[in-house]
């Protein structure tokens, strides 16, 4: 099988063949025909060559060591030479045509006499001529020899004068041209095809389209325009409300939200969409848009389907209205009505029940709030509600840095170190910035606070937008950059040293040297070459018998025996002529020619007798040198030396150098007196003082409260901050921070630069300056680490508790927590416990006067003894019936933790023997308990062997549980159920108010609470078949306080756990269960609770340790 072909050397052959077959015919000529012709070429091709492949495989052949030989046909690639048939295209004139001037023209065998050849052997005759070669002529209605036959052509067709054949006019066909063109064709010989679309008919002569109803356009390609339909789109659509009519029938297609023949009926309520086919999904009384289905919510709701109540703080339609409730009042999401917190009343909860500045149950406590910054003091708790911009326990602090507004919860948007107004959030921009958020730098030319100051920088210096200080360009210095760099320095800040030598001037911008006359080189280190002198050494010496000329002035240095300006005279000075006998009349040191006595003027002079100086702007020999460009001078250069006459404060050959630092005046002869980095003006010696200094010599500091150049700015620092005289920056005193030291240290910090960490505890406020702690109500100590001592409470622990009968007092509010047997606000009312069932509950006794306490106590003891005797009798009967029965029961086990505030409890399979109370136990938080109403049957566990109750020295109550032999537990039933955590446990009291010899049971009870905790119970016993009446105690958990503890022994792992029971105040109700087999146990209650006859079972869930034990036992 051939997989691929590799052509070698084929392309040159193909190219040659193609060149040989091409011609000059125009291939686009419709009369040019082409055909493919074949030819052969030799190629090398690859193919798959089969071969026999031997391989080995495992098999059961013992003789060959379980190895067998196998064969299979495989393929590999091989190459061979062969012939390849190729094809090439060849073009020539089609049959009936011949080539003429690169075109294929038709050929007629008989020459067309009165016409032209239009197709092979076909002539197109001129009007009035006919025949195969257009040589015959007859009138329009006749044909044949002598034109004797009459033409039979119809519809205006012409007949051939020779044959009588009809030549049909446009739109007709047939032997006599009596037939119209077929459908879909038109024109001459019916050769044209109609272009009409959408079923339109075509005129057989012209091809014009006749559109069907619903279409228009030259080819009927367009639908009727909107609002029109029918034949020629002349009928008007009747559709309403944006309905679209069918372009043919006019039937209306309604938009979403409308229905009916003409779309005139809106969707019925609860429906929407096209044809009203979809059902609205809006909740809470919301209505939906009939077109889109979008929900329009009723007041108080929002969300895509109106399923959400308004967020807290908003109410009404679209939740667009803001609640007006004050002082923590709750706002009704529909109408905005306020539900006030305790202590407030009024339509908006704006009226406190206590007068201003007081709080408490009797409005007798003074609010600790700073009234100036306090919105309100809670009339019940005394809690301070701060005004916007204030925070802290007593509203004595401003918002932390970066926050503002109510509760200091809004984040400031200020940038570039700006302060934020703690009330409004308005940005107080730092100097150099402006804008709402201080994000914009001051415009060029301005600086300072609010960009209100104008810069005073010269010579394109950059002005700091913060303090207006000038950053000079290269070559300038001074407070306002108005002074060139002093002599010998250049560059930025005039910090670079000039390298110019021999009196060369240094450019203060780039440090380039301008050499004095007579010197050259980059650093003016080279004298002029021999024979040259002057500026840039461009002048030529004019000396005859001299040892060169002076490089600066050009004076000739005459050789011995020669004199004169050019050293060309042997006569002594002032003489000339033969024997030097004639006297010269030349002035100003000129010499005269030894030959003719003409004056040769000294440099700087001119005239016949050299009595005149050079014209302004020129100097030197023959006054031919132009003065240099003097920068700071009184006029043109000196006529002799070319030296510039510098103004005060300048020096150098071109007067382009400022006096050296510390000098000023004409020829820099004055000595500056400026101090404290003041800049001396080189012209008159006046001082430009550095910011923060004033005075003629800059020796006086700015007076307090002022800063900047000439001390023109006023400081804006607060709270004792130090103001920098240079830039006005505030150095805050301890306890303050911010741009102008207007903000206290952030919470938790104090002291210098707010770097010290506060040590206050229990939510106490920390003084931002000293770090001293201001304790919250109920705490005291240096760091507020101590609760108020016993019998005191409140702010500063200055209020005395008013609780009686060994009751405890809340260290914050002073609320009394009564000891067992007492109730009332001051625990001054005794309580009598009466036992009954759920259907006939006895009420607690009325309040007993304090002076009748002993009588009530004796009566209670008597009743208690009777109850205990009755329970003992029942217990004896119960024990007799329980003998021989299965004693297995679940035990309460607790997941170990360290003071865990959760409800992780587990019911294990059974209680083991010999459980011992361990005093070193972990703690668990007591859960909330609920009022038990009608009980339903729960799983029952029978036969607790013994329950012993003892009281420890620390007044804590302990329950010691001991089970019977765990080997007697039934293994026939093993299931896991999930039960509510509020299944109850009941029991009876003995003479000591404790339980003895009681069974253990669980029952489910309906709750008025909305909480729904669950626990997993492993191996529950068989459920009882009937309802059980149970006694109960309502247990409620107020604020967490110190409490007594009950210890429950755990399983065989000996993990002992203690759970914390919070103080409770509740109505005590008693009951006993009608079924004698269902006796109940009781956990000990805290010392400040009433004695119950029933206690809630702790919420339980299966623990990992319990599961591990179960798997081991199984």
UniProtKB/Swiss-Prot annotation:
Pfam families in the record: EGF_laminin, EGF_PEAR1L, hEGF
Signal sequence annotation: 1-24
Covalent S-S links between cysteines: 33-94, 59-68, 93-104, 108-117, 112-123, 125-134, 147-159, 153-166, 168-177, 190-202, 196-209, 211-220, 233-245, 239-252, 254-263, 280-288, 282-295, 297-306, 319-331, 325-338, 340-349, 408-420, 414-427, 429-438, 451-463, 457-470, 472-481, 494-506, 500-513, 515-524, 580-592, 586-599, 601-610, 668-680, 674-687, 689-698, 715-723, 717-730, 732-741, 754-766, 760-773, 775-784, 801-809, 803-816, 818-827
GO BP terms, alphabetized: cell adhesion; phagocytosis; skeletal muscle satellite cell activation; skeletal muscle satellite cell differentiation; skeletal muscle satellite cell proliferation
Record-annotated EMI domain positions: 29-106
Keyword Calcium part of the UniProt annotation: no
Name of the protein: Multiple epidermal growth factor-like domains protein 10
